[in-house]
Structures are given as structure tokens and as C-alpha cells.
A protein has these predicted regions:
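Extracellular and secretory-pathway beta-repeat/beta-biased strand scaffolds
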Residues: 2-301
Length: 301
């Protein structure tokens, strides 16, 4: 592990072999399990949907890129939503235009790539399971035309809400998992073999799934003293991981945009979680952790 400091400012942590980093934080409790997705409105592409109003919703896309707006998008415990897409490279953007957060307490599956946008917040509960080729959960929005043009630039409202994962996210080989918001907390398991994992906190985030940069985060969202989790507890960091992030043969990046006067850690790394990127054959694992602010990363253990 190499930690670089310039003029007292921690710039980044880069690990290019087998890495195990332990993280600290508290695990939130969950007071709701959500409903099933309601009122789909297709904005782009060809889509057919069956099982509306039941515990098993099936979304069948007929084009490589689709955009669907929903009044709400949650999956209750025991519920299941399947996105059946033309190929593993097909991408479906799903945006919540109502006023309720998304709670994934059941199963969310796809043979392709999924994006879930909800400015009210996204929560994957301990029973929640996401199994896709790629998965992006964000409280920052993306312009429809940018999405269709492969320009994955996300913008927030100035005080964007958080993305919290306490469940299990499994990404197919070579895919990506991205959790983006004003703050991000992971106490679950995120696995992306030969793929990429990105946790980003800020008001402007750009994802690059092709190049080595993966993610650029700019524009701070909150002062930490004003951010609370779902239980009302004040958060100690913009990105907090007490679970497992694992991308063997791939890349993991954690980055938060903060004000220069921030007194608490932007990225919290402690003793109860792990960040793992082990090399596979000729493919090394890589981890990048950091932000431009002073005392931005805290490592314990």
C-alpha cells in the first residue's frame, strides 16, 4: 500500500496487488421494506412489462438502451423484479419521479446492465439481493440524452441524499457496481469479479466504464454535521464501508468531494469491513481511495 501526501494533503491510496483494507462504522437498522414498483412510463426504447401489482414483476426490453420513469421503485421482502434484456451489454435506466425513497428488500435481477436513479434515496436492506451484469444506484440524476450517448455524467441538487447498501450486490464478470450520492454507506457485500466498483459522494460525478479513471467526483454536497443516516444518527464520513467490496482482477475506487475545511474523514476505513482487489492471472487488482481535502481518509486496524 502506498499513501501519498502533498503539502499535508492526503491525495490517494493505490494498491495494485492483493489488498485487504478494514473499515469502520455502524450498521443502520431498517424500519421499512417497501412496496413493488409502480406506474412505469417508458421514455425511450421498446419495453413490455408483466406482473404489475404482483410479487414478481418482469420487465422485458427489446432495445439495447431503455429509459423508464416510475412513480416509485421498491421491492418488498419476498418480492422479485427481473429485467430481461437483449444482451449482457444492454442498459436500462430506471428513474423514480415520485417522492418516496427506493427500498430493495427482495430480489433485483438482470442479464444486462441496470441503473436506478432516485433523488429521495436508495436503500438495499440486509435481505436485499441485486444480481446483474452491471448496477448503478444514484441519488444524482442523469440527462436522458447523456445516457443514450454513453455520457455518464450525474448531477445533484446541492444536498443530495444517500445510497445505503446492507444487502448483497453481485456483478457479472467484467461489469461494474457504482453507488453514487451525497453520501454512501456500505455494510453489505459488493462483488465484481474482473470488474469495477465505485463509491462516490458529491454533487457532480462522471463515470468512465472504458478508461482507467473509472470515476471523477467534484462539487461537495454537505457539511458532515448536517448528514444523518436513516435512523437519524449523524454520519462521521461521506463514504463509510463496514462491509465487503471485492473486485478481484478489477478496480475499486472510493472518492468524495469535500470542502477544504472539513474536519472529519471523507472516506472512513477502519476495522470491521474489507476492500479486496486480488490479481487474477495477468490482471492485477487496483484500489484507489481519496479526496482532495485535508484528513480525507481515515485508516484503522
Amino acid at each position: 500500500m502506498v499513501i501519498n501526501k502533498v503539502d499535508g494533503k492526503l491525495k490517494r491510496v493505490v494498491v495494485s496487488t492483493l489488498v485487504l483494507v478494514t473499515l469502520v462504522g455502524t450498521r443502520p437498522s431498517w424500519s421499512y421494506s417497501g412496496e413493488m414498483p409502480t406506474n412505469p412510463q417508458v421514455q425511450s426504447g421498446k419495453v413490455s412489462i408483466t406482473g404489475t401489482g404482483t410479487d414478481h414483476l418482469q420487465v422485458n426490453t427489446k432495445t439495447n438502451k431503455t429509459i423508464i420513469n416510475w412513480d416509485s421503485f421498491s421491492i418488498h421482502s419476498g418480492g422479485r423484479v427481473d429485467f430481461n434484456q437483449p444482451s449482457a451489454n444492454s442498459f436500462s435506466l430506471n428513474r423514480v419521479v415520485g417522492s418516496t425513497p427506493s427500498s430493495i428488500a427482495g430480489q433485483l435481477n438482470s442479464n444486462g446492465k441496470l441503473m436506478l436513479i432516485n433523488p429521495n434515496g436508495v436503500v438495499i436492506t440486509p435481505d436485499g439481493v441485486v444480481n446483474t451484469r452491471s448496477f448503478t444506484a444514484s441519488t444524482l440524476d442523469i440527462n436522458n440524452q447523456d445516457f443514450l450517448s454513453d455520457n455518464y455524467s450525474f448531477k445533484g441538487t446541492g444536498k443530495s441524499r444517500g445510497v445505503i447498501n446492507s444487502g448483497k450486490i453481485t456483478i457479472g464478470g467484467g461489469g461494474h457496481a457504482a453507488l453514487l450520492g451525497g453520501y454512501v454507506s456500505n455494510s453489505g457485500i459488493v462483488t465484481a469479479r474482473l470488474g469495477k466498483i465505485a463509491l462516490g459522494a458529491g454533487e457532480k460525478i462522471t463515470l468512465d466504464f472504458v478508461g482507467d479513471g473509472l470515476m471523477k467526483v467534484t462539487v461537495p454536497s454537505h457539511k458532515l454535521s448536517t448528514i444523518t443516516d436513516v435512523d437519524g444518527n449523524t454520519l462521521k464520513s461521506l463514504i463509510n464501508n463496514t462491509g465487503t467490496l471485492k473486485a478481484n482482477g478489477g478496480m475499486i475506487k472510493l472518492s468524495a468531494a469535500t470542502a477544504m475545511g472539513l474536519s472529519r474523514g471523507a472516506v472512513n476505513i477502519g476495522s470491521t469491513g474489507s476492500v479486496i482487489a486480488q490479481g487474477i492471472n495477468s490482471k492485477p487488482g487496483k484500489i484507489v481511495i481519496g479526496s482532495p481535502s485535508v484528513n480525507s481518509v481515515r485508516i484503522a486496524g
